[in-house]
Amino acid sequence: MITKSRAVLIVTASLLFGQFAYADDAPIKVNVDNFVRAETASQFDRFLKAYVGGKVNTWAHIRMPSPIDNQTVIRMNRDTLYSAVIVDISKGATLAIPDAGDRYISIMIVNEDHYINKVYHKAGTYDLTMDEFHTSYVMVSARTLVDSSDPADIRKADH
């Protein structure tokens, strides 16, 4: 089940709560020069529509390990809970990662050029800026390790 809140990860953002906006609705020819940006825009758009009703800056959480026959991304791990958000960082944003104790977590930042600028593993507060990530929007993708055979561990990781 996917919901909009989780105590494990919080993004505090001082930004506009809008959707992707395009000045011209005319089709853009995709070619070798713009393919990476176009493919990333397509992936971001699919995520926004499928999980958060088109809303930027809204977390989506997959609260159970992904079944083998229903994976939104190729090769999702069976021992992992996933969370993600598309964040408008044009005016700055902050990622706050709480202490997860011994539990493995990773938070990957993917920019609009499909470049992974950073992967965070430690608790802390991190500024998400265009100087560092080079695009107005990024996907923050979080992974939390669980024992998928233990419902109690899944519940513990998901609170």
Residue ranges, per PLM feature:
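Bacterial N-terminal signal peptides that target proteins for export
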Residues: M1-L9
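Bacterial N-terminal signal peptides
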Residues: I10-G18
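N-terminal export/targeting leaders of redox proteins
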Residues: I2-T3, F17-D25
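A compositional/structural signature for long, glycine/proline-rich flexible linkers
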Residues: A23-H159
